[in-house]
């Protein structure tokens, strides 16, 4: 039981597990054992010899727990570990079974404000009532009552053993000694006999008991370690003491200087002020905020800004007129190209009407040459009606106009035939529609 509590305490404190060493004495038929436990480098020894090895180890673990719980830094931790596992309730139940009394009965009373209740617990054991310290909840109040009952019974057992002339057997368990002391106390106080009433009697004796678990644990000082609560607080060295004293002296001088400066007379304000470090007057603002820059946004499709009027020799812009940089360097505005509309003709649409031109064929008579208007536009040179070529022995007359007229006639017929092709295609489409 005590070994388990000591092991749990070591695990919560981030220490190595406790190690036990046993010493055996006496003959083989009646051996005696004495154990020592090493807890975080400290050695705790059982106060007496025990008949079994297990009892000796439990006795050494109990000594270690009692020693650790009595120390200042570890006071609340050891007591809390013993409380959370319900050790004291189990011990009281075992004492009640040894005495032959009914099991312990716990009662809690609530007091205080509604949002901050206070619970006080009492436990009745063998007709005796024990009252514990107040707590913030019922469960802790019952544990405090069991703790107070166990501490009172231990003190009663020590007082009884010291008053008895005959020495007791040192091999007996602590529970047996406490049960015997409780029986003697009941007989002495006439508790549970026919002459006394059946109502429970409060425990009359008052013993000096250490508060194994304070109701409101105080925070440990800054010099102690939270991880290693069993290390005693170190005493400050001489150098640290001198530095602390110097710091406190400087603080007092600073306070006095500030007070004298604030309450000095008006005629003494212009005297030399006392020296005060600048860190005392350090402002909260560590720097100036950057200036705010406002940018003017020009829409994309807006009209370009008006250019400034041209400066002549006589007229100049005043120096006070400010032209923004965006207006000075305005981007060029591009104008979209004109829209061109093209007429699309469907494939199966009817062909557009064709303008028919009638060409006038030239009429050539004998001895004359007539040229149409088309021939006149082409400005073809006109040859004389007849040419006389003199040849030896004979004269030959050639009429070139006849040749030219025949050529022009052939050209006109070729044009008429080419212009008549669309007309035949149109006639074909009309025939298909019909």
From Swiss-Prot:
It is found in: Cytoplasm. InterPro entries: AtDRB-like_DSRM_1 (IPR044450), AtDRB-like_DSRM_2 (IPR044451), dsRBD_dom (IPR014720). It comes from the Eukaryota. One of its GO terms (biological process) is miRNA processing. It holds the Pfam family dsrm. Disruption phenotype: Flat, serrated, blue-green and ovoid leaves. Residues 402-434 are annotated as: Disordered. The keyword Transmembrane does not apply. PROSITE patterns: DS_RBD (PS50137). One of its GO terms (cellular component) is cytoplasm. The keyword RNA-binding applies. Transmembrane segments: none annotated. Keywords: Cytoplasm, Repeat, RNA-binding, RNA-mediated gene silencing. Residues 1-70, 87-155 form the DRBM domain. Binds double-stranded RNA. May be involved in RNA-mediated silencing. Heterodimer with DRB1 or DRB5. Interacts with DCL1 and DCL5. This is Double-stranded RNA-binding protein 2.
């Amino acid at each position: 039981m005590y070994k388990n509590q000591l092991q749990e305490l070591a695990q919560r404190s981030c220490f190595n597990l406790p190690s036990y060493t046993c010493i055996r004495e006496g003959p083989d038929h009646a051996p005696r054992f004495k154990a020592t436990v090493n807890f975080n480098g400290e050695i705790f020894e059982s106060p007496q010899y025990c008949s079994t090895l297990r009892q000796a180890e439990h006795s050494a673990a109990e000594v270690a727990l009692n020693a650790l719980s009595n120390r200042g830094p570890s006071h609340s931790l050891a007591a809390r570990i013993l409380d959370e596992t319900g050790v004291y309730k189990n011990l009281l139940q075992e004492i009640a079974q040894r005495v032959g009394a009914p099991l312990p009965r716990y009662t809690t009373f609530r007091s205080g404000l509604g949002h901050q209740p206070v619970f006080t617990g009492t436990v009745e054991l063998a007709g005796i009532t024990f009252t514990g310290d107040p707590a913030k909840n019922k469960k802790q109040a019952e544990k405090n009552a069991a703790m107070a009952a166990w501490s009172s019974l231990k003190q009663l057992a020590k007082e009884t053993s010291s008053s008895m002339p005959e020495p007791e057997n040192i091999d007996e368990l602590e529970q047996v000694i406490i049960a015997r002391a409780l029986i003697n106390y009941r007989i002495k106080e006439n508790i549970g006999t026919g002459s006394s009433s059946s109502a429970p009697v409060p425990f009359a004796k008052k013993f000096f008991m250490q508060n194994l678990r304070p109701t409101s644990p105080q925070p440990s000082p800054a010099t102690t370690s939270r991880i290693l609560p069993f290390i005693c607080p170190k005493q400050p060295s001489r150098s640290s003491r001198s530095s602390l004293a110097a710091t406190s002296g400087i603080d007092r001088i600073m306070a006095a200087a500030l007070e004298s400066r604030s309450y000095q007379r008006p005629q003494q304000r212009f005297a030399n002020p006392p020296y005060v470090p600048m860190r005392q007057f350090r402002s909260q603002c560590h720097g100036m905020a950057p200036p705010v820059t406002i940018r003017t946004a020009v829409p994309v499709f807006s009209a370009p800004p008006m250019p400034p009027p041209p400066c002549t020799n006589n007229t100049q812009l005043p120096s006070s007129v400010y032209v923004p940089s965006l207006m000075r360097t305005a981007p060029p505005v591009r104008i979209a190209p004109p829209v061109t509309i093209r007429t699309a003709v469907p494939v199966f649409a009817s062909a557009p009407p064709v303008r028919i031109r009638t060409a006038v064929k030239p009429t050539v008579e004998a001895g004359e040459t007539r040229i149409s208007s088309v021939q006149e536009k082409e400005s073809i040179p006109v040859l004389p009606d007849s040419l006389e070529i003199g040849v030896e022995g004979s004269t030959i007359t050639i009429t070139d106009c006849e040749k030219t007229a025949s050529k022009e006639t052939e050209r006109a017929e070729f044009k008429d035939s080419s212009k008549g092709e669309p007309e035949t295609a149109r006639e074909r489409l009309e025939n298909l529609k019909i």
